[in-house]
Amino acid sequence: KREKVVIFGNDYPTPDGTAIRDYIHVSDLADIHVKAAEHLVTNQQSNILNCGYGRGVSVKDVLEIANAVNNKPIQTEMGSRRAGDAAMLVSNVSKLHQLLDWKPKHNDLSFIIKTAIEWERKLMENENA
């Protein structure tokens, strides 16, 4: 529904100047939550875990993949950095893998974006029905 996506900053100390983030598929995130709950019940021990794939992707790269998956260009606008935004946020997932023996099922950004777009389209169809 948005006319364009705002890229907040292109002057970060990253290869393309945009922020880098660790994106995760919602199904993998849900799987982690289930495994964490099972671990808590079994071991009676809570932990703090980083959820992600342990690799970062720039905002520009995400939009390039989204354009390819969507078969339609997403309009973008360059904006200023937001206060407090870090140049790079990538999860250290070693504890997650060690403690929960978790392995990602959807560790492909094209698939993550494709399923997100499909979900949004389904929501819009239901909204317009």
Residue ranges, per PLM feature:
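C-terminal substrate-binding subdomain of Rossmann-fold SDR/epimerase-dehydratase oxidoreductases
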Residues: R2-A129
